[in-house]
Amino acid sequence: MPVVKVRENEPFDVALRRFKRSCEKAGILSEVRRREHYEKPTTVRKRAKAAAQKRHAKKLARENARRVRLY
């Protein structure tokens, strides 16, 4: 859990902003959303496989775009 120590003469808004940023970096909100509802292991694997295929297609598209030069 991110801990933010409020400095002397520091406005509350600034400390809150630092806390939110540290939570975002730690990935707490995304973890909470992911664990909000139970997801079957098959669904997890299926989603991970779909994400991997999407990443691969994106990588291939980038490589093909780099090869094709429009003159």
Curated annotation (Swiss-Prot):
Stretches the record annotates as Disordered: 39-71
PROSITE patterns: RIBOSOMAL_S21 (PS01181)
UniProt entry tagged with the keyword Ribonucleoprotein: yes
Origin: domain of life: Bacteria
Annotated source species: Vibrio cholerae serotype O1 (strain ATCC 39315 / El Tor Inaba N16961)
Ranges of biased composition (kind: Basic and acidic residues): 60-71
A biological process from GO: translation
Name listed for the protein in its UniProt record: Small ribosomal subunit protein bS21
Residue stretches of biased makeup (Basic residues): 43-59
NCBIfam families: S21p
Keywords: Ribonucleoprotein, Ribosomal protein
Keyword Ribonucleoprotein: yes
GO molecular function: structural constituent of ribosome
GO terms under cellular component: ribonucleoprotein complex; ribosome
Family named by the database record: Belongs to the bacterial ribosomal protein bS21 family.
